[in-house]
Structures are given as C-alpha cells and as structure tokens.
Amino acid sequence: VYFHQNMLIYEYQSTDWRITMKAYERLLKYVTFRTPSDENSETTPSSACQFELARFLKNEMEGLNLSDIVLDDMCYLYGKLPATTGYENIPAIGFIAHMDTVSDYCNHDITPVITENFNGVSLTLPAGITLSVHEFPHLGTLKGRTLITSDGSTILGADDKAGIAEILTMIEHLQKDNIPHGTICVAFTPDEEIGMGAEHFNIEQFGAKYAYTIDGDTEGEIQYENFNACKADFHIKGFNVHPGSAKDTMINASLVAMEINNALPAMETPRGTEDYEGFYHLVSMSGDVSEASLNYI
C-alpha cells in the first residue's frame, strides 16, 4: 500500500483468511475521523478531534493484545507487541505514523472511491477532477491496479492514516501467522502536518532501538532524510487616507507586500527547485490598504 494526499494505491498480497481486517479496510474506517491539525493553535494536540481517533486506535490496539498501551494527555499513543520466545534479546524495532491531516483543503465528509483495474492513463473523480499521466507520470505504472481516492471534493487522508492501517495490519499478521519477531514498538502521533509531531514524543516510553516512520509515497521506497523548512510571516502596516488626497501620504500595505514578494528570486519557488535546492514558498497572503500579511515556508 502506498499513497498520496488524495490517492491510495492498493494491492493486497496475502490471501490468509485469518487476517481479520485488510489494510485498506482499516484505512476506510480511519478516514471517517476528521483530524486536521491547526497551525494557529498553541495547545498539543492542536485540535481536540485528534483524540477521537487516538481513543479508537487505543481500543483497537487493546483488541490486538498489545502491551504497555499509553495514550498521554498530549495525544501521543504508544504500545508494544512483545517478542516471541527466543527473540527477547534482539533490538526492539519501532513503527510510527501520524493521526492528523492537513487543514488547508476540505477535510470533512470524506467519501472514498475505489477504482479497480485502473486504465493507466487518467482517472476522473466524481467531483470532476481528472488525474492524468501528464500531470502525474507515476500513474502510468499503476495500470491494472486498484486505486482508492477521495471523490475529489476533499482530501482522502491517506497521509497518514494509510500508515496507521499498515502498521496495525502488520501487527495482526505477525500474531496470526505466528511469525517470530523481537519487540515491536508502535507510536501514533499528533500534529505532524504542522511540524510538531516530534515535539513531545517520549522516546523512553516508545522503547525502540531503531524505528521507521510509515509515511511516504512510492512503493518500496525508504527515505533516510526528511523535509525541513522554516516559517516566515510578514505583517505590514500601511497608512490609509482618502485616495483623493493621498499624494505622497498613502502607504498601501498590499502594494508593499507585492514588492516584498517580487524582491525574492523568481525561480526559487517549489515549482522551480528540486533535491537540496532551497525555495521561498508563499503559502498564503491577505491584505488591504491598511494591513497585509505574507506567510512563507
């Protein structure tokens, strides 16, 4: 299973009837929980709704017989699958995923759409949005696969609820197939989308020697570095007077904001950069004559 914000590509390999829930079935349940994080909040978690999913996952982890399950007051959820006999002394390995979703696109009333035997060329969603190979070349490799998307009017939330689904399905698979393993540590965190997912992460409670974050896209890919950015906010105060008598007096805050943005290198934006090249990304802007703001990462 791998995923983008609006698309989950799914191919289930196991035919073991003992597995109670497949990963995609868990994902379809998890996306019914609305969990956007809020970058303007000063609390942890930044949105109380993340606790609703956390409590649901805690109950599921109890049903999977995990031990040392802890949901702390900052919405970090931890648990362990004890080592099988003879594997108690090997290093514990951990798996991490985050519960929050982005807040800058519609994230409620999500309607998943399952498309079987994808044609490998384009996919038109019920809301009228078309995903094409021209815009997303990787789609060409998915011919014949089953895709799970939103209906195009919302996000799907596969980032990172698909990661949660994969981890708990793996836990179930290890137990029901009696696969030998060392201690498996699990953690589900809040507020990753606003850069705060690790802020209150309790490494001691987690307990892993090594760990993987299950949050990516290309199938089989392992990333050993992570995205890193800083935030820059400009707040501009203008001077507003009647435009009929404004000569040499008015300072239009919106025009000043435009000047600031135009002073930045035109090609040093996400569209014009790659790999380790830095960029200035104008996330949002607002303004009038009296006040204006620019928000960058």
Residues covered by each model-derived region:
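A non-catalytic alpha/beta surface segment that caps or lines the substrate-entry region
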Residues: 42-90, 94-96, 100
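Buried hydrophobic packing segments
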Residues: 57, 166-174, 257-261
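Active-site metal-coordination/substrate-binding segment of hydrolases
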Residues: 87-180, 188
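N-terminal capping segment at the start of a domain
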Residues: 22-48, 148-149
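Short, Lys/Arg-enriched N-terminal segments with co-localized hydrophobic residues
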Residues: 1-20
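Midchain, well-structured core segments that form catalytic/ion-binding scaffolds
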Residues: 145-158, 191-297
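Catalytic-loop motifs flanking and including active-site residues across diverse enzymes
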Residues: 53, 159-166, 253-256
